[in-house]
């Protein structure tokens, strides 16, 4: 134990200096966010308003106008409950890729949207959800831009806010508050869906409340609801007991007084204690959910389930079950300890068929010993242009077949009549989606070189509805029509498309209740729907439109399989309501039902209880109060005003090559994570193709003074790296016979050119790079003192080199530290370009192989 005595102001100064050092150290080790590159052939345009600069590909103009209206409207309301307004910020749009995501970073500050609608999204437009969630993050950062933090940010640049938020504001608040915003300011939101409740409710009822640190930080061993789920309930509960503006107060106090130790959990006019709030929240939710459990157990009509016994060592999910034969089920297994894997379950024993780590949306279809699915496919050079290929895997022959390439397809399904015909959802580079029918037949091709554009496979492309996203198509029983879920500004509905005529007919009205996973059996359409706060199985008579609930589990389900007892139609061949009711009593189900150990497989009978799809579900906890507090809903009524048009201009890449966003009163080498005495300046453009760092470094050893510059440009296919520095060096050597003291200036520069190529297989990501580099070093002597000998100095030194890099690494599970399988090879050759040449050759290889223990 030690004590510091002296002037209190000196103690405060010391604390400030320590925290100041920690901020910049955090900035170094967190590095700056450099995104993957878009295709350099894209021409960019921009829309500028007082709130944002929207940058997007030129072919995305119509959708960019709509998104600009959304952002402009959201910016007026999104920061109110944080006591701030949205600052002006760049927004970069990535299209023409299979990724669906949003990102906010603050060094340099920007939002990035990957706008391809995912089929497993809830009942709300994908880009609208991105706007609400990510813009709330912007306001969180702006709420920190006060007091001493604002002063430091004005002086040193954008990385100050990023460092303050990363060090002092918990991630659960950042993500949970953003989920609260998307829920409170939309007719739905993730906090409104049954998923969040299901995950947290099962944990509290069956495992109990974990200690706060474990609940907040997560666990590699036990399943803990993530920062989004945990954070949503923490933030919503905090507002319910402290009021709407609780976090406006906490963030302001943190921003102004962090240097005094008033960090997030100790900030506010009435200090906020997150650990105390967690205890109160857990107790409150537990009482509510114990009451719900008691009511469910007392119900007469609920699913009688028989669990399919599978040995579980840890939290594991089994989804997308499909029964094959009498005793076997294929399903998708996933956990943090292993890769997403296709498994065969027979009499309680699990046999791994194939790891499918890049399978999209946990979805596949099955027919005659083959599974059909969509898989992530890496672009050879441009990281933002990834595709989603359709793959067929014959697990009996253990062979893959590539069905499509160089396009984006989701949710492929076999035709029930002709296995050589499949349907899928195709997304183009403008985010327009359509239902496509493909006929690869028996001529599946193994190479992408032959099947580049999927030509000669299309039978039809239907269902191109404006501003509509599709998900989970299924065929009619005669294979002549497609049923599909449509998502629009009005929510989700189910539609039918006649393939021959393209005619569309609506089966359900649009609703913000989430629905997914369509299947048709014996004249009934089955799907998963939000039923009174849980995801349950519902079916609809295609003849009468009457609907019934087929399951009622404790927490909800994610997927299902219908394994009905054979039932014959009446003499007319029709399915009357009476025959349907009689048949439903014979329908056996396999459900992927949730509990605290993950999604398990259970057997159950269809319940066939009448339900009205138009009856509204009860509001989840907190949602009504949150919406009243925010006082703004982004819904379909927002689309009524179509008169607003924004001026669009070309976005010049050369004119925006440099964006100086931050500097530091230290030497900071972000690439090498090095920190020292000096000063550093940073620039990075919006497209992440131009990254510049330069500054001054002082070294108390032999290099007294150094000016340095590093620059990376990745806007062309080759990637160029330039590094140069100018040093003032000195050296003193002493021995019994002689003393040498030398001073000289040293100028070193190098140019590196890399040609990368990336591809992936079913289980590995592979990269190969060819590297060429040139460097020179020039010495300018300033002083040389040696009384005994003369020394010759090589004042100019040039080198040229070539390199080869190859990495083939298996996909990693969440808990993996390094890949289980893989190889990394590096070859380097370098020669001097002088009168007395010297050569250098190196080879290194790193091999990853499994061991007795997992690398976790």
Q: Which residue ranges define each predicted feature?
A:
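Outer-membrane beta-barrel initiation region
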Residues: 298, 314, 320, 605-717, ...
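Hydrophobic beta-strand positions that form the internal "hydrophobic ladder"
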Residues: 329-330, 371, 421-422, 482, ...
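Acidic/His/Gly-enriched intrinsically disordered linker/tail segments
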Residues: 34-39, 108, 125-130, 138, ...
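A short beta-strand motif characteristic of beta-propeller blades
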Residues: 305-312, 349-355, 398-404, 444-449, ...
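Beta/coil-rich, acidic/histidine-enriched accessory regions frequently appended to metallopeptidases
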Residues: 35-38, 43-46, 222-225, 250-363, ...
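Transmembrane beta-strand segments of outer-membrane beta-barrel domains in Gram-negative
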Residues: 723-855
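Juxtacatalytic substrate-recognition/specificity segment
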Residues: 30-164, 170
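A flexible loop/linker signature enriched in serine peptidases of the S9 family
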Residues: 191, 315, 333-342, 354-361, ...
């Amino acid at each position: 134990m030690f004590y510091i005595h002296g002037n209190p102001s000196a103690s405060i100064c010391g604390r400030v200096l320590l925290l100041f050092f920690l901020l910049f150290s955090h900035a170094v080790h967190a590095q700056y966010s450099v995104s993957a590159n878009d295709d350099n052939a894209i021409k960019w345009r921009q829309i500028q308003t007082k709130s944002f600069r929207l940058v997007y590909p030129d072919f995305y103009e119509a959708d960019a106008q709509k998104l600009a209206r959304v952002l402009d409207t959201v910016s007026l309301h999104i920061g109110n409950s944080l006591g701030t307004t949205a600052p002006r910020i760049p927004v970069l749009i990535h299209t023409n890729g299979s990724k669906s995501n949003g990102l906010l970073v603050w060094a340099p500050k920007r939002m990035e949207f990957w706008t391809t609608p995912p089929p497993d999204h809830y009942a709300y437009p994908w880009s609208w959800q991105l706007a609400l969630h990510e813009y709330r993050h912007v306001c969180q950062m702006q709420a920190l831009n006060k007091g001493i933090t604002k002063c430091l940010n004005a002086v040193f640049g954008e990385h100050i806010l990023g460092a303050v938020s990363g060090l002092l504001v918990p991630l659960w608040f950042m993500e949970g508050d953003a989920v609260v915003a998307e829920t409170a300011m939309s007719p739905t939101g993730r906090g409104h869906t049954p998923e969040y409740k299901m995950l947290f409710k099962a944990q509290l009822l069956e495992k109990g409340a974990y200690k706060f640190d474990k609940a907040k930080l997560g666990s590699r061993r036990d399943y803990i609801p993530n920062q989004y789920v945990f954070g949503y309930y923490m933030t919503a509960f905090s507002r319910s007991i402290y009021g709407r503006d609780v976090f406006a107060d906490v963030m302001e106090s943190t921003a102004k007084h962090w240097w005094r130790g008033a960090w997030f959990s100790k900030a506010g006019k009435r200090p906020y204690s997150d650990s105390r709030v967690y205890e109160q929240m857990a107790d409150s939710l537990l009482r509510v959910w114990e009451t719900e459990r008691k009511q469910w157990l007392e119900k007469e009509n609920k699913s009688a389930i028989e669990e399919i016994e599978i040995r579980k060592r840890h939290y594991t999910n089994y989804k997308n079950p499909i029964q094959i034969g009498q005793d076997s089920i294929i399903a998708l297994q996933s956990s943090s300890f292993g890769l997403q894997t296709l498994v065969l379950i027979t009499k309680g024993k699990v046999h791994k068929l194939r790891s499918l780590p890049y399978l999209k949306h946990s979805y596949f279809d099955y027919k005659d010993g083959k599974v059909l699915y969509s898989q992530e496919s890496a672009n050879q050079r441009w990281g933002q242009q990834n595709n989603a290929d359709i793959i067929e895997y014959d697990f009996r022959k253990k062979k893959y077949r590539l069905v499509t390439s160089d396009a984006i397809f989701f949710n492929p399904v076999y035709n029930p009549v002709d296995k050589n015909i499949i349907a899928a959802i195709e997304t183009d580079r403008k985010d327009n989606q359509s239902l496509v029918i493909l006929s690869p037949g028996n001529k599946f091709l193994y190479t992408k070189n032959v099947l580049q554009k999927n030509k000669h496979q299309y039978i039809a492309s239907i269902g191109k509805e404006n501003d509509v996203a599709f998900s989970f198509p299924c065929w009619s029983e005669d294979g002549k029509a497609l049923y599909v879920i449509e998502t629009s500004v009005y929510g989700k509905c189910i539609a039918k498309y006649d393939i021959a005529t393209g005619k569309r007919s609506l089966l359900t009205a649009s609703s913000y209740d989430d629905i997914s996973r369509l299947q048709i059996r014996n004249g009934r359409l089955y799907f998963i729907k939000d039923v009174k706060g849980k995801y349950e199985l519902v079916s609809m008579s295609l003849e009468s439109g009457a609907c019934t609930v087929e399951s009622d589990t404790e927490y909800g389900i994610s997927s299902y399989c219908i394994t009905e007892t054979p039932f014959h139609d009446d003499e007319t061949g029709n399915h009357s309501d009476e025959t349907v009711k009689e048949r439903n009593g014979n329908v056996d189900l396999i459900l992927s039902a949730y509990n605290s150990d993950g999604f398990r497989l259970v057997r159950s009978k269809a319940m066939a209880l009448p339900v009205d799809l138009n009856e509204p579900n009860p509001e989840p906890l907190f949602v009504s109060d949150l919406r009243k507090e925010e006082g703004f809903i982004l819904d379909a009524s927002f689309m009524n005003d179509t008169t607003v048009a924004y001026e669009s201009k070309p976005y010049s890449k050369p004119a925006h090559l440099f964006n100086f966003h931050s500097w530091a009163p230290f030497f900071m080498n972000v690439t090498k994570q090095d920190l020292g005495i000096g000063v550093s300046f940073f620039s990075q453009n919006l497209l992440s193709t131009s990254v510049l760092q330069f500054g001054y470094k002082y070294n108390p050893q032999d290099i007294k003074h150094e000016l340095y510059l590093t620059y990376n440009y990745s806007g062309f296919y080759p990637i160029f790296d330039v590094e140069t520095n100018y040093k003032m060096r000195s050296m003193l050597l002493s021995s019994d016979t002689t003393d040498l003291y030398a001073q000289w200036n040293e100028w070193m520069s190098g140019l590196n050119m890399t040609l990368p190529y990336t591809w992936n297989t079913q289980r590995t990501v592979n990269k190969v790079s060819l590297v060429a580099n040139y460097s020179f070093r020039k010495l300018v002597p300033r002083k040389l003192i040696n009384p005994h000998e003369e020394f010759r100095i090589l004042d100019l030194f040039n080198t040229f080199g070539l390199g080869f890099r190859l990495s083939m690494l298996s996909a990693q599970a969440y808990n993996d530290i390094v890949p289980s399988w893989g190889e990394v090879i590096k070859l380097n050759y370098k020669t001097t370009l002088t009168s007395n040449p010297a050569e250098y050759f190196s080879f290194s290889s790193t091999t990853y192989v499994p061991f007795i223990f997992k690398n976790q």
